[in-house]
């Protein structure tokens, strides 16, 4: 009897502990249930990952521990290496002018706006940047997105339906392909830069309401330039629209950096221009569409990534305003990129390497073919102080692995020569060149 009385006194003291243990039991049971349900999926994923590794196409992520520049440091080493694989074409990613402009925007407009554009996410800075970009490209109007991927994803669905046709180059960027898949238009694909095939499709689709020819201005994996004059001529002949992505040309390609339309002599003949601020324009984030005022107004009403994504941060907008202002005040920035490009291409070709792409474009793919060879080649280049990456399937077609080098205005001629010297040493060591 006394024992029962003592137990009644002690029991309330253990009640909180019991509740804690019971709660932990429930959480563990829940976790075990999730693990069991996901085990089959994880097993299948691990098999897929093993297959990728066995094929030599698994993509490791090297960790950079410095600012993006011509010289960087990589995790695991304090030694600086030369970076020849960034989209930092104009060398502005670490520009003191852009950093200062971003700081000023932080002070004046804050860190973020916590809103989409049509609620309370549009500032005077956003409107100023849109005006600058439209002026830079010689277009009527511009609409900003969080990224060019969003700009491409939100364009076609808003404008075209089943009465229309979207006619796309077969090697267009993944973001373009995804954007086209989202729309209800009839979809056609022409062989890469094949104008006869494009004309065949234009002839077949003359009964449709609108036809839109869609192409990258410069193709990112090969560095080749779309034949925009021929495309525009066909568009005029068959009453079609022309849409281009200028991500790998705006700001640095063409005499004054106005991109592929300037390089090909078709300024004023392009209906829609999409591009990014994440490459030559400082390398941060942001994308856009330039078009007529009517098209841009419709995109503001119907483009889903624009309507349902947070507005671009003020610091990014402030830096971008500075970038476009600099480009419109001076045309000298692209000149250094071109000089570095010609030096690299001339020396590499003379050494016996096979390079893809246009002679004037800073994307200089060194073609190797085998995926495992491309990965090994890149690793040996890093040992020699040159940071490059091997590209293989599914980023590029099977059997067309390469090291995609990219020249920058941040590189000195001496650094470009060091890069070529390393390529020659590794190329001879691995039997790529004699």
Residue ranges and their predicted role:
Residues 100-148:
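Conserved N-terminal alpha-helix of the aminotransferase class I/II PLP-enzyme fold
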Residues 4-6, 10-30, 37, 41-111, ...:
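N-terminal "arm"/small-domain region of PLP-dependent enzymes with the aminotransferase-like
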Residues 2-28, 96, 100-104, 108, ...:
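PLP-dependent enzyme catalytic core of the Aspartate aminotransferase-like
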Residues 88, 188, 192-244:
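Active-site phosphate-binding strand-loop segment of PLP-dependent enzymes
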Residues 162, 182-184, 238, 269:
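Short, structured coil segments at secondary-structure junctions
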């Amino acid at each position: 009897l006394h024992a029962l009385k003592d137990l009644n006194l002690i029991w309330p003291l253990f009640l909180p502990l019991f509740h804690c243990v019971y709660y932990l039991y429930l959480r563990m049971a829940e976790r075990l249930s999730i693990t069991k349900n996901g085990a089959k999926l994880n097993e299948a994923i691990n098999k897929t990952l093993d297959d990728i590794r066995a094929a030599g196409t698994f993509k490791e992520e090297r960790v950079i521990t410095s600012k993006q520049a011509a010289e960087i440091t990589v995790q695991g080493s304090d030694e600086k290496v030369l970076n020849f694989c960034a989209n930092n074409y104009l060398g502005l990613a670490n520009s003191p002018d852009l950093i200062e402009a971003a700081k000023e925007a932080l002070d004046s407009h804050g860190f973020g706006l916590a809103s989409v554009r049509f609620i309370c996410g549009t500032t005077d800075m956003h409107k100023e940047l849109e005006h600058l970009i439209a002026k830079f490209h010689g277009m009527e109007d511009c609409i900003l997105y969080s990224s060019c991927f969003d700009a491409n994803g939100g364009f076609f669905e808003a404008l075209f339906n089943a009465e229309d046709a979207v006619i796309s180059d077969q090697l267009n960027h993944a973001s373009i392909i995804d954007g086209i898949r989202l729309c209800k238009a009839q979809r056609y694909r022409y062989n890469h830069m094949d104008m006869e095939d494009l004309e065949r499709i234009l002839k077949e689709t003359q009964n449709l309401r609108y036809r839109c020819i869609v192409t990258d201005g410069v193709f990112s994996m090969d560095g080749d330039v779309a034949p925009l004059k021929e495309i525009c001529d066909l568009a005029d002949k068959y009453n079609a629209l022309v849409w281009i992505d200028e991500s790998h040309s705006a700001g640095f390609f063409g005499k004054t950096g106005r991109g592929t339309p300037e390089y090909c002599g078709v300024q004023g003949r392009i209906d829609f221009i999409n591009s990014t601020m994440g490459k030559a324009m400082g390398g941060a984030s942001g994308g856009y569409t330039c078009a007529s005022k009517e098209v841009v107004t419709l995109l503001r009403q119907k483009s889903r990534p624009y309507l349902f994504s947070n507005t671009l941060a003020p610091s990014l907008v402030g830096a971008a305003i500075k970038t476009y202002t600099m480009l419109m005040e001076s045309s000298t920035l692209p000149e250094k990129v071109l000089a570095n490009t010609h030096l690299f291409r001339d020396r590499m070709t003379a050494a016996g390497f096979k390079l893809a792409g246009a002679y004037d474009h800073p994307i200089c793919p060194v073609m190797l073919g085998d995926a495992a060879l491309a990965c090994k080649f890149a690793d040996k280049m890093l040992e020699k102080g040159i940071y490059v990456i091997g590209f293989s399937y599914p980023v590029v077609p099977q059997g067309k692995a390469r090291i995609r080098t990219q020249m920058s205005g941040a590189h000195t001629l001496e650094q470009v020569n060091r890069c070529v010297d390393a390529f020659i040493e590794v190329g001879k060591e691995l039997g790529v060149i004699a």
